[in-house]
């Protein structure tokens, strides 16, 4: 059960999330892996989660009718949000807003087939008061098995 050096799913997700629109991260996505990227901004954490779930489903990163896939994605999203929000998933209640780029990557990072597929969610952007200029950078990463 070795983690393959060329198959670091979290690193791939982070590089995709960090890349600007006009940048293309130098990545070689392994054959059979799936990913999507997008942007989301809100004072409502439920909208942030919903936007990422919708992107993953509409880009066929996860299957819409398989509960364990949605469940794994949800936990990876929440773990990444913990990083962005420093463990406090509240946004609107404490007058905070986020503007984030995200990447969701699905693949097999281990060399053993029995380890199965994993999903990684990376978030990068800003968090702060809902006043332009009153924010700072933040980053989060969540990885979960499917």
Swiss-Prot record:
InterPro entries: Regulatory_HutP, Regulatory_HutP_bacillales, Regulatory_HutP_sf. GO terms for biological process: L-histidine metabolic process; positive regulation of gene expression. Antiterminator that binds to cis-acting regulatory sequences on the mRNA in the presence of histidine, thereby suppressing transcription termination and activating the hut operon for histidine utilization. One of its GO terms (molecular function) is mRNA binding. Transmembrane segments: none annotated. This is Hut operon positive regulatory protein. Keywords: Activator, Histidine metabolism, RNA-binding, Transcription, Transcription regulation. It comes from Bacillus cereus (strain AH820). Homohexamer. Belongs to the HutP family. The keyword Heme does not apply.
């Amino acid at each position: 059960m070795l983690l393959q050096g060329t198959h670091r799913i979290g690193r791939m997700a982070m590089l995709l999330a960090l890349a600007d629109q006009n940048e293309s991260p130098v990545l070689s996505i392994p054959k059979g892996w799936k990913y999507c990227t997008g942007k989301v901004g809100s004072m409502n954490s439920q909208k942030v989660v919903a936007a990422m779930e919708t992107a993953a489903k509409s880009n066929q990163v996860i299957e819409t009718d398989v509960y364990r896939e949605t469940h794994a994605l949800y936990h990876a999203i929440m773990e990444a949000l913990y990083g962005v929000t420093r463990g406090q998933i509240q946004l609107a209640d404490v007058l905070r807003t986020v503007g984030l780029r995200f990447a969701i990557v699905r693949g097999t990072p281990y060399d053993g087939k029995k380890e199965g597929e994993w999903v990684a969610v990376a978030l990068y952007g800003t968090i702060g008061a809902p006043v332009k200029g009153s924010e700072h950078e933040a980053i989060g990463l969540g990885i979960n098995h499917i």
